[in-house]
């Protein structure tokens, strides 16, 4: 809720918050308010808990016998894990760190790539964004086997639609590049996404000329 239509939306001033609402201090960016601090802690702790579980999954997958998986199950599981890890760190970066445009040398957030008790050393914002993008790029390689992207079967399209899939990862990657200030790669990734959807002939209907214009826009 807080990363979807709650806390983040109130910060963005997308809601007309009543003066008596518990959301009011958030809309005024009063992060030290006693009503706000538990929400902030919950976002931080819950998101890192999800990241810890993803790292447990990825660690077990690395040690697993791939022969026990059917078809492309291993690649999908590993790709989803990497992509979600990058995505969740990206969400935390946007809430708790400076933007690269403001100060790329400021400290980012701890980037956790394995499960354990030790807290990762905080790198700079720019370095942390590099970690995020690296996870998303690696996820793209694994998710190329995603049936939503690779298969022509309508059944598999429906089956994979609500998972973290190839298309979702490409869009998150484009957003990450854009937030970092790398417009060239952001547009390239978004253009690749548009063309892959058009060539697949499903999900969306977009004029190819419009897609070309968007992908070439600076």
Functional labels for PLM-detected ranges:
Residues 21-96, 123, 142-143:
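Conserved, well-structured interaction surfaces
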Residues 93-100, 147, 179-181:
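Short coil/turn linking the two alpha-helices of tandem helical-hairpin repeats
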Residues 53, 135, 142, 189-192:
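Alpha-helical solenoid repeat scaffolds, predominantly canonical TPR units
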Residues 163, 187-218:
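Hydrophobic-face positions in mid-chain alpha helices that act as interaction patches
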Residues 1-9, 212-214:
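Acidic, glycine-rich segments characteristic of secretory precursors and extracytoplasmic regions
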């Amino acid at each position: 809720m807080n990363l979807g239509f709650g806390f983040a939306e109130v910060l963005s001033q997308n809601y007309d918050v009543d003066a008596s609402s518990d959301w009011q201090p958030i809309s005024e960016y009063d992060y030290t308010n006693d009503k706000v601090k538990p929400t902030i802690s919950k976002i931080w702790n819950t998101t890192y808990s999800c990241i810890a579980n993803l790292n447990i999954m990825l660690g077990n997958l690395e040690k697993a016998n791939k022969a026990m998986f059917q078809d492309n199950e291993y690649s999908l599981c590993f790709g989803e894990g990497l992509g979600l890890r990058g995505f969740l760190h990206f969400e935390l970066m946007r809430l708790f760190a400076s933007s690269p445009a403001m100060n790329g040398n400021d400290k980012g957030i701890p980037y956790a790539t394995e499960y354990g008790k030790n807290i990762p050393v905080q790198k700079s914002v720019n370095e942390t964004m590099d970690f995020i993008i690296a996870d998303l790029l690696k996820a793209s390689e694994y998710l190329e086997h995603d049936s939503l992207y690779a298969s022509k079967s309508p059944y598999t399209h429906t089956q994979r639609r609500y998972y973290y899939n190839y298309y979702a990862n490409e869009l998150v990657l484009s957003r990450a590049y854009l937030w970092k200030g790398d417009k060239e790669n952001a547009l390239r990734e978004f253009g690749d996404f548009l063309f892959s959807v058009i060539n697949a002939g499903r999900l969306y209907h977009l004029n190819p000329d419009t897609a070309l214009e968007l992908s070439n826009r600076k």
